Design a protein with these regions (language model features):
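Bacterial Sec-dependent N-terminal signal peptides
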Residues: 1-25
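Residues that line or immediately flank small-molecule/substrate-binding pockets and catalytic motifs
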Residues: 8, 154, 176
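A domain-level signal for the mature, folded cores of soluble proteins
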Residues: 18-160, 179, 200-281
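Extracytoplasmic
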Residues: 145-147, 167-169, 193-195
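Short consensus segments that form the blades of beta-propeller domains
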Residues: 161-163, 185-188
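Extended serine/threonine-enriched, polar tracts that run as long, contiguous segments within proteins
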Residues: 164, 169-182
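Short secondary-structure subsegments characteristic of cysteine-rich extracellular domains
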Residues: 188-206
Length: 281
């Protein structure tokens, strides 16, 4: 009686993680892509349409925090153990880091305004800490399981040619603890820090190749590029473009998390209402 539910659980995992399993004649062929599959997957992300500046009737840039503790955001967090997962399925953090290491993502920045680039060595300083302890050394690394969220920068704009409100993701940054505090129980630092920033259009090719588990149809995985462009995540607005130097909500509403959330909802609602207001005479 207990074998059937277990079989139903294992089957989707096998179907997703082991390509060509139905056509394989020997074990070595399991997981290898067929020529037809390679040809079908040899595509790129859907190109953005050209937007004329004169067609943008209104726009606003916002910074949002995506909390990976929320269930809807879990596809960006998992998998954290890749020993039994196909090579094209990685967490968003591992995908970005692999793209940086291999040179697919050439430009990495220290902030969301792209004012200064950082090198691979500077990224390692934020991800790896070697602590000397007498004759021994302990190495601490920020891994996928240490990433607690993402900061995303995007623009909402009203396209007067199409007559609708649209969103374009501009940049994103993984958020984690300070690597210097890892392994130090005496230091309580719950602050999350931006590890690095990437310009989203430059990451689309590699995010398109990396797949996300699709619980509704395991034979048709979704790419990170599709997921992000569709805004399949829950977020809280942290900052908006404003006259006060783009200050954060926490800078003018201090010490009250509830009021900060209410202010974030107010900003989100004002953006949503902008499309309706455009059609009012």
């Amino acid at each position: 009686m207990n074998r059937l539910p277990l079989f139903l659980f294992v089957l989707p995992f096998i179907a997703f993680s082991q390509a060509n399993i139905l056509n394989a004649t020997k074990v070595d062929e399991i997981g290898k892509q067929t020529d037809a599959r390679i040809a079908a997957d040899n595509d790129g992300p859907l190109a953005y349409g050209y937007i004329d500046e004169r067609d943008i009737l209104w726009s606003k840039v916002v910074w949002e925090f995506v909390d990976l503790n929320q269930k809807i955001n879990l596809p960006y967090y998992f998998p954290i153990d890749t020993s039994n997962i196909s090579s094209d399925r990685r967490s968003l953090f591992d995908t970005l880091l692999r793209g940086i290491r291999k040179g697919s993502i050439k430009n990495v920045y220290s902030d969301s305004f792209f004012t200064s680039k950082i090198t691979g060595a500077e990224i390692d300083e934020k991800l790896v800490n070697v602590r000397l302890n007498g004759d021994y050394s302990d190495t601490f690394r920020i891994k996928t399981q240490d990433i607690e969220g993402y900061m995303m920068k995007g623009m909402w704009y009203f396209d007067k040619r199409l007559g609708e409100l649209k969103y374009r993701l501009l940049a994103l940054a993984p958020m984690g603890k300070d690597v210097l505090t890892l392994g130090l129980p005496d230091i309580e630092d719950e602050e999350l820090y931006e590890l690095f920033w990437v310009f989203y259009p430059e990451t689309r090719d590699i995010l398109h190749k990396s797949k996300v588990f699709n619980p509704k149809n395991v034979s048709q995985p979704i790419s990170y590029d599709h997921l992000l462009n569709a805004r399949r995540f829950n977020s809280v607005i942290i900052r908006e473009e404003n006259v006060y130097g783009n200050r954060k909500i926490a800078d003018y509403i201090r010490g009250n998390a509830l009021f900060q959330l209410l202010e974030a909802d107010r900003i989100k609602e004002s953006i949503r209402n902008k499309e309706i207001d455009m059609w009012n005479y």
